Amino acid sequence: MSNTLIVYYSHSGNTRKMAKIITEQLHADCLEIIPQKSYPQAYSAVVNQAKHEISQNYQPDIKDIQIDLNKYSTIFIGSPNWWSTIAPPILTFIMQNQNHLINKEVIPFCTHGGGGFGHIPQDIKKLCSQSKILTGLASYDSTASNTDIHKWLTKINIL
């Protein structure tokens, strides 16, 4: 049993790819956050919906999580960068599980189309104020290689 969990939401597959690499390198458990209602696939439609949801601090319903978060001491949280912050399904996950994140190492990672991390690390630090937030990694689309991720995990003393 691993004491590390990789939690992520992915719309286009980029964040999923990054999450899978982290999972494989750490031999960790992995949990995909899935919204009850899928986002549109058309780029302009998802951009407009995400912008509206984020401006309203909206927390969409997500599918039930069948995992005991208490057994993990380290939790990676991955999201696409949507309007410089986490995707709403990840906000829902964090808000529903704040008590289970207390005193844990929380490590953000994201994929983006040019906006870098935006303010994702600061947002996660604010939402997980009683957690130890470690340095995250932002990847353009899904360009983070196995080597890039290995170097990052080594740098933050996870490997």
PLM region spans:
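N-terminal beta1-alpha1-beta2 submodule of the flavodoxin-like/Rossmannoid cofactor-binding fold
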Residues: 1-75, 84-87, 92-96, 102, ...
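Generic anion/oxyanion-binding catalytic loop in active/binding sites
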Residues: 4, 79, 138
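Short, glycine-/small-residue-rich phosphate/pyrophosphate-handling segment
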Residues: 107-144
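Redox-cofactor binding/interface segments in oxidoreductases and associated redox assembly factors
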Residues: 77-78, 108
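Solvent-exposed loop/turn segments at secondary-structure junctions
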Residues: 12, 37, 82-84, 113-116, ...
